[in-house]
């Protein structure tokens, strides 16, 4: 039986967090935070199933690169207690396999984030043993990304 779990958090400098670090963790990657010079390396983390960045059609193409997107967010927010991103962690039903997980998340993100002009970075984790705790991390902008004006 599927177990419902949804957790929401705010990634804030005031609590010592970084959007770049959160993105590196969820994507099991290594990203340099240009704001504070810290290299966040989660390449040894296991269980990454899928990752994708969803952007509104008018968002800059270079935001498809995770490091560029989240460093732009860090650069844009200037104060020591800036709210940088919203983070969602949602349990995925073990009864389904990877393809329906991707489809469910893609539909949800397009309807709830992209349609409202927000970027969202998503990753599915299925840690060892596989099927034990499948879940998705969604990192979204706090502020709606505005279309570029000519």
What are these language model-derived features?
Residues 1-145:
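N-terminal nicking endonuclease/strand-transfer module with a His-rich metal-binding environment
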Residues 146-150:
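Short "domain-exit" segments at the C-terminal end of structured domains
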């Amino acid at each position: 039986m599927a177990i419902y779990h949804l957790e929401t958090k705010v990634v804030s400098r005031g609590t010592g967090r970084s959007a770049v670090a959160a993105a590196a963790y969820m994507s099991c990657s290594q990203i340099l935070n240009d704001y504070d010079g810290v290299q966040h390396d989660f390449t040894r983390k296991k269980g990454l199933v899928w990752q994708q960045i969803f952007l509104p059609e008018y968002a800059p193409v270079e935001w498809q690169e995770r490091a560029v997107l989240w460093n732009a967010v860090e650069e844009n927010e200037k104060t020591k207690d800036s709210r940088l991103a919203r983070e969602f962690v949602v349990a995925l039903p073990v009864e389904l396999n990877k393809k329906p997980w991707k489809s469910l998340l893609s539909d949800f993100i397009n309807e709830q984030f992209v349609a409202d002009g927000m970027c969202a970075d998503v990753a599915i984790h299925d840690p060892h043993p596989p099927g034990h705790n499948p879940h998705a991390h969604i990192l979204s902008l706090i502020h709606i990304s505005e279309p570029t004006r000519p």
